[in-house]
Amino acid sequence: MKHFIHGLSLALILAVCSGFPAVPNSAHAQTAQAVGSNTGYPLPRYVSIRNAPAHLRLGPSKAHKIDWTLMHAGMPVQILDEEGLWRQVKLYDGLRGWMHKSLLVGARSLLVFSKGRATLHSKANGDSRVVAYAERGVILRAQECAPRWCRVRKGEIKGWVSRRQVWGVEANETFK
């Protein structure tokens, strides 16, 4: 039986980040891997929002104005820089700001970002059985990513999605 996953609509996501154009993620082709000055973890890297609401600030302290309030726990963000307890993050549409590290968690999630809907397959192969469809804007829990496919979960539904259909993983990144 095929499932259709309903979730965040594009309109809800854009309500959070309206007015900001999408920015391609091409500025990170570096020869040497940068690491965070506080954690020693690679930069850039992806994490998820721990709980909602989560405040995105103009700078790395509570003294800086809240620029946006993000309402979706689990949404992937890309950490670009670290300053003390603060992380400079980028959202799927290119919007940047600072978040306290307590608002972030290392669990990986992916945002369906393809035109239309993403197809979840039973195997990491486009010819395998379709197990579900996920609308644009749905947040999927990433379990592993191979060179072209990521194994994901949404509730009890599990499958493989093409990396071309999601945002939240570097081009050459693999993990289990």
Locations of the language-model features?
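SH3-family beta-barrel domains
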Residues: 27-58, 69-73, 80-83, 87-95, ...
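Short, solvent-exposed loop/turn positions at domain surfaces
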Residues: 64-65, 125-128
